């Protein structure tokens, strides 16, 4: 598997499949939002699409910082659940698809307690027709999943310096484990990806 911010073209989709990629993760919102045509190319190449939610660019209002614990509130979880569901429907994602909500920073236990659990509690209430997944460091994935707020985990193991990854077992509900950034291909098929297993 892999995830990327590069646009998926026909050449890139065929190349990824040829090197053994079966799942492609892409953001559904923000700067690098996937398009319906990209999803079609992924599926037509015989791969599966993995939706990741994280606000960026025009998705943000005011001084929001999605890499800070203060972003993760109950109200923000409610808003993000509604936005993610609406976007998933527009993209034609089937019901019961798992959407991975990103906690893309080294969150400490006190931040998980004060903010992140409340955010995911709201997601679990307000995200209708889709499943809540979590993308983040091992500790955050484990804590949120053990609280019953995420069905599966997409582990940010590439961030080896995160305290939430050091000496922490991979969550028992892990579906994806991101571990290495690289570039593949050449010409029209060249693409930068994060390797995932």
Segment roles from a protein language model:
Residues 1-4, 13, 141, 146-197:
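Functionally critical loop-and-helix segments that line ligand-binding/catalytic clefts
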Residues 1-4, 23-26, 47-52, 97-99, ...:
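Hydrophobic faces of well-ordered beta-strands that scaffold small-molecule active sites
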Residues 1-23:
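N-terminal module-boundary/linker segments of secreted carbohydrate-active enzymes
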Residues 4-7, 26-106:
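Substrate-binding cleft of extracellular glycoside hydrolase catalytic domains
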Residues 13, 39, 81-85, 117-124:
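Generic structural signal for well-ordered alpha-helices
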Residues 107-130:
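Active-site cleft segment of glycoside hydrolase catalytic domains centered on the general acid/base Glu
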Residues 128-143, 151:
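Aromatic-lined carbohydrate-recognition surfaces of secreted/lumenal glycan-active proteins
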């Amino acid at each position: 598997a892999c995830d990327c911010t590069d646009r998926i073209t026909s050449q890139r989709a065929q190349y990824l499949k040829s090197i053994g990629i079966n799942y492609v993760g892409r953001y559904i919102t923000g700067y690098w939002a996937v398009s319906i045509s990209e999803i079609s190319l992924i599926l037509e190449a015989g791969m599966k699409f993995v939706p990741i939610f994280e606000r960026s660019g025009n998705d943000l209002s005011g001084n929001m910082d999605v890499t800070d614990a203060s972003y993760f509130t109950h109200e923000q979880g409610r808003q993000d659940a509604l936005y993610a569901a609406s976007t998933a429907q527009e993209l034609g994602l089937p019901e019961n698809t798992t959407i991975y909500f990103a906690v893309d920073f080294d969150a400490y236990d006190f931040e998980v307690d004060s903010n992140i659990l409340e955010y995911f509690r709201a997601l679990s209430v307000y995200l209708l027709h889709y499943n809540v997944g979590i993308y983040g460091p091992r500790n955050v994935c484990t804590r949120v999943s053990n609280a019953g707020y995420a069905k599966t985990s997409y582990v940010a193991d590439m961030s080896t310096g995160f305290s939430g990854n050091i000496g922490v077992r991979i969550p028992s509900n892990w579906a994806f484990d991101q571990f290495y950034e690289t570039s593949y291909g050449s010409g029209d098929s060249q693409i930068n990806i994060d390797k995932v297993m």
